[in-house]
Amino acid sequence: MKKIIYNFILKYLIRWKIQGDSFSSLNSLKKSVIITAPHTHWVDFYLGILIRGGLDFKSSYLAKIELFIFPLNIFLKWTGGVPVNRSSNNNLVSQIASIYNKNKEFRLSLAPEGTRKRVKKFKSGFYYIAIEAKVPIVMLSMDYMNKKTIISKPFYPTGNKKFDFDYIENFFDGVIGKVKEYSFYK
């Protein structure tokens, strides 16, 4: 029933389309790192929740620990939020990779920019998580100009960071975010 409601909101209220070869594979992939870009506005979070619900798959996301205060913490945990301390160097990549190894099913959604501001290069944490956990990366674009999301086929990192990042960044190059001037361009 929830899937029907999410899809109704996406299709009829905000007129958003979901395209790609692999939205069925999101559920068949028990483990993956899902990167969503461009992340330019706080509204992206709610659009992501709608897309995730419309596709009927579960995923978690990281949020700074400072946000997990009552009563907001209830909502964040309910929507899949995992609190992280970003202020200290606590080997976060290995900690997250160990979550994949301990669970039969775990999907983590991340914004590869690491901020809502414009960046010229993506941060690399998601990449190293995927390599260490031995899971594919699925790319999901939020194109506000065309009101659509495109989902990539699963991409298995080769370990050649330059090659892999060229491939990943090309997928998102020129996709217009909610705040156009913060969109990702190579």
Regions found by a protein language model. Name each.
Residues 1-19, 183:
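N-terminal membrane-anchoring alpha-helices
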Residues 170-186:
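Charged phosphate-binding loop/patch that engages nucleotide di/tri-phosphates or the phosphate backbone
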Residues 16-174:
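Soluble catalytic domains of membrane acyltransferases
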